[in-house]
Amino acid sequence: MCLGLPMTIVETDGVSALCAFRGEQRRVSMLLLSNPPVGTHVLVYIDTAIRLLDEEEARLIGAAIDGLGAALDGEDCDRFFADLIDREPQLPAHLRSE
């Protein structure tokens, strides 16, 4: 399984950026984004920033990663997915029939 990580830009030169997530830093390509500033949250997949995230999205993705770890350890993981409990799943707009 491949996961995108919600990382925060620490420094950037426009082409690449040093990004951080939970104490880990890595240099990632910024070629798919239009030069976001330091402090911006980005979704990083295979050392490439693929889209901008707002703070809430970054928090939710981080919680989901924690939930996956808890599930793999055999622990209860509901608290990590509080935004999904007690609601029906929803298809993205582009998959809904009109």
Swiss-Prot record:
It comes from the Bacteria. GO terms for biological process: protein maturation. Gene3D superfamilies: 2.30.30.140. Transmembrane segments: none annotated. GO terms for molecular function: carbon dioxide binding; iron ion binding. It holds the Pfam family HupF_HypC. InterPro entries: Hydrogenase_HupF/HypC. Disulfide bonds: none annotated. NCBIfam families: hypC_hupF (TIGR00074). Belongs to the HupF/HypC family. PANTHER family: HYDROGENASE MATURATION FACTOR HYBG (PTHR35177:SF2). This is Hydrogenase expression/formation protein HupF. It comes from Bradyrhizobium diazoefficiens (strain JCM 10833 / BCRC 13528 / IAM 13628 / NBRC 14792 / USDA 110). The gene is hupF.
